[in-house]
Every structure is written in structure tokens, then in C-alpha cells.
């Protein structure tokens, strides 16, 4: 014995079981699903690599104008000013979520709560 695993048996039996299951459902293969959390981790890695803005520009611009209109009507903004506000806002939110996540981990939780 070389310590390796023994060859698997009943391969034909497993294949028959698979084909009968497919025949029972009418040959419709159910769509592939990832385990819970796998897609979330993949998205976290993707967004941590990227540097682009995550909030859409026009909705953010409307929000800025709405908030500014409470102080003074008919204010005008340079496009670079709105972009600077968006960069700062997203940086603040990312930092806030990082701190929130650390608090959740400290409390032995995974989910962040409001």
C-alpha cells in the first residue's frame, strides 16, 4: 500500500442515478447556484481592486442639488465640484462600512446592522 486512496467503485451506478434524476424532472437541468457568501466575497474582491465611482453620477448630482436648494435656490455647480463631492462621499461611506464591519466582527457577528 502506497498510502494513496483506493479507486472509486460504483461509477456506473452513480451515472445511472444522475440520468434517472434528469429523466424524472423532464430533462430540465436546474441552474447552477453558488454557496451563500461566495458571490459576496467575489464582489468584495472585485470592488476592492477597482477605483471607479460606485454611485451613479446623475442621481448623486440630483441629491447634491436637492440638499443645496435647502440653503439657497438657483445655485450652480462646476462639474468638477460635484465629482469632488462624490469622491469624498464615497470615500467616507467606504470607511464607515469598514469600521462597521470591524464592529460586527468584534461582536462575533457577520451581518452589519443599522
From Swiss-Prot:
The family database entries (PROSITE patterns) matched by this protein are listed as: HISTONE_H3_1, HISTONE_H3_2
Stretches with biased composition (Basic residues): 1-17
Q: Which UniProt keywords apply?
A: Chromosome, DNA-binding, Nucleosome core, Nucleus
**GO CC, one annotated term:** nucleus
- Bias class Low complexity marks the residues at 18-28
Q: What does this protein do?
A: Core component of nucleosome. Nucleosomes wrap and compact DNA into chromatin, limiting DNA accessibility to the cellular machineries which require DNA as a template. Histones thereby play a central role in transcription regulation, DNA repair, DNA replication and chromosomal stability. DNA accessibility is regulated via a complex set of post-translational modifications of histones, also called histone code, and nucleosome remodeling.
Which organism does this sequence originate in? Stylonychia lemnae
| Oligomer status and interactors | The nucleosome is a histone octamer containing two molecules each of H2A, H2B, H3 and H4 assembled in one H3-H4 heterotetramer and two H2A-H2B heterodimers. The octamer wraps approximately 147 bp of DNA.
**InterPro entries reported in the protein's UniProt record:** Histone-fold (IPR009072), Histone_H2A/H2B/H3 (IPR007125), Histone_H3/CENP-A (IPR000164)
Q: What Pfam family does this protein match (any one)?
A: Histone
The similarity annotation says: Belongs to the histone H3 family.
This protein's source sits in the domain of life called Eukaryota
Cysteine disulfide links: none
| Name of the protein described by the UniProt record | Histone H3-3
Its annotated compartments are:
Nucleus; Chromosome
One term of GO molecular function: protein heterodimerization activity
Segments of this protein annotated with the region Disordered? 1-32
Amino acid at each position: 500500500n502506497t498510502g494513496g486512496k483506493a479507486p472509486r467503485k460504483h461509477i456506473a451506478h452513480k451515472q445511472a442515478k444522475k440520468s434517472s434524476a434528469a429523466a424524472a424532472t423532464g430533462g430540465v437541468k436546474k441552474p447552477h447556484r453558488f454557496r451563500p457568501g461566495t458571490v459576496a466575497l467575489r464582489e468584495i474582491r472585485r470592488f476592492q481592486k477597482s477605483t471607479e465611482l460606485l454611485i451613479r453620477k446623475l442621481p448623486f448630482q440630483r441629491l447634491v442639488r436637492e440638499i443645496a436648494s435647502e440653503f439657497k435656490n438657483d445655485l450652480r455647480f462646476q462639474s468638477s465640484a460635484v465629482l469632488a463631492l462624490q469622491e469624498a462621499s464615497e470615500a467616507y461611506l467606504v470607511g464607515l462600512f469598514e469600521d462597521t464591519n470591524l464592529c460586527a466582527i468584534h461582536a462575533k457577528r457577520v451581518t452589519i446592522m443599522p
